[in-house]
Amino acid sequence: MKIFELLRDVLKDWLRQGEYTVWNMTDYEENGFVTITNNKALYLVEAKKFLLDFSKMELRRPSRKIIDSCLADKSKSEIIRFSHIEQPQDLEKLCVFTDFEGKKTEIAYNYLKYFDLNRIIIYEYRKDHPVLVYEYEDVTNEEVLRAIVMPFMR
């Protein structure tokens, strides 16, 4: 299942209620990105590398050392697949991020979420320092995915 299809399913109730708007669906085919927004946050989704197989459900212990080393290395910033961008007034959470065009961009973050295949990593920025909140591996069950992601999307 492709990422925007999954997200539309996860957010279908909110979409139906008009709380969320899906932007740039054509960009999915051209650039591999879909933008979803509401009044509180902007979600930029890198779509092409996120495919899920819902054939099994398995949660494993995280590999934090690998995650931290990748996040600390700015040259590996392409590992960031899914970012939750808070309002610009949250300047105490300012950090530097390489966006999908490769340009250095300063954005205020609350949560950083990394979705790679069936792996979910959620960071919270505290004074420009990313703190691991949750990591789940081999999450291929839709209900488990919803349970993990939904609290961070409200």
Q: Where do the model's predicted regions map?
A:
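DNA polymerase processivity clamps
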Residues: M1-R154
